[in-house]
């Protein structure tokens, strides 16, 4: 089942490319609102707060109260959960970056030069001022690049994150669709037992990290425990002064979907108070 992750610049006709691919291949298109809803549901945060954070609109105080690593893990888990369903296209929120190591996922970036984008936006919104269109495009680009930098520390314009980069100023929408459809049909992007295993291993790791966050808070992964997943088997390493936490973590992770076994190599370090 085809899985496509697409990133598109504003006013590049990327939505037309996405619609054309979905129609040709019978794919569901997953928009960012669905990802936001799922993250809000898992974290207990209001959807409006999740949206503001992902759009780069949160205030400085709000950003202090939001753990970047935890939000990036929640985003990663939602994207991986969606990809595991198959037969869909995921647009935005770092899906192309998060899924680029999955062999059967086609990661696409749609872009175009600024003059082309200005013209598209002016026609779409009925604008007569090119400068106004440019400002809106630049604001949108900055917000999206800021989100990728904040969550994953990457430049979304880096072509190495994608299977294919298409410039719609030079390549018509219909030809973009054809190029991407051909990639999904190529043996290089065929789903195999190995590629499915790679996806599931990353998904189980994301589920495990989420479970640890929910049960013990971010300190479990930031200060003490490290989590590794190999073919569904979880290995805990690290050190902690909390011996009960080790036993609790093993029991917790045994119940995580996709986990087939848990081994702990976490060292218990006795707490020795400093002498006065």
Regions found by a protein language model. Name each.
Residues 9, 34-35, 93-95, 112, ...:
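Short, ordered loop/turn segments at secondary-structure junctions
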Residues 82, 88-116, 120-122:
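RNA pseudouridine synthases
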Residues 35-87, 127:
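ATP-dependent small-molecule kinase phosphotransfer cores
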Residues 5-19:
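Glycine-rich phosphate-binding P-loop
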Residues 1-4, 8, 232:
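Pre-Walker A (Motif I) flank of P-loop NTPase domains
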Residues 101, 112-113, 119-124, 140-141, ...:
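N-terminal targeting leaders
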Residues 28, 35-52, 113-122, 126-143:
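Long, charge-dense
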């Amino acid at each position: 089942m085809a899985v496509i992750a697409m990133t598109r610049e504003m006013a590049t006709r990327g939505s037309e490319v996405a619609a054309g691919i979905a129609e040709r291949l019978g794919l569901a298109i997953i928009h960012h609102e669905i990802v936001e809803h799922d993250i809000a549901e898992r974290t207990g945060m209001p959807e409006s707060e999740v949206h503001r954070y992902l759009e780069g609109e949160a205030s400085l105080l709000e950003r202090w109260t939001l753990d970047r690593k935890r939000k990036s893990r929640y985003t990663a888990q939602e994207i991986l959960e969606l990809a595991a369903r198959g037969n869909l296209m995921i647009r935005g929120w770092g899906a192309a970056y998060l899924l680029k190591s999955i062999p059967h996922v086609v990661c696409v970036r749609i872009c175009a030069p600024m003059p082309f984008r200005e013209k598209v936006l002016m026609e779409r919104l009925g604008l007569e001022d090119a400068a106004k269109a440019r400002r809106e495009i630049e604001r949108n680009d900055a917000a999206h690049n800021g989100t990728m930098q904040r969550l994953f520390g990457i430049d979304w314009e880096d072509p190495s994150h994608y299977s294919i980069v298409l410039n719609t100023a030079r390549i018509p929408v219909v030809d973009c669709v054809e190029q991407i459809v051909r990639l999904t049909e190529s043996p290089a992007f065929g789903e195999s037992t190995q590629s499915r295993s790679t996806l599931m291993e990353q998904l189980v790791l994301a589920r495990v990290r989420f479970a640890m966050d929910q049960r013990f808070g971010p300190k479990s992964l930031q200060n003490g425990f490290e989590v590794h997943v190999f073919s569904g088997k979880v290995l805990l390493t690290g050190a902690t002064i909390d011996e009960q936490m080790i036993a609790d973590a093993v029991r917790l992770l045994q119940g995580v979907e996709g986990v087939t076994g848990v081994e702990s190599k976490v060292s218990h370090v006795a707490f020795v108070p400093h002498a006065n």
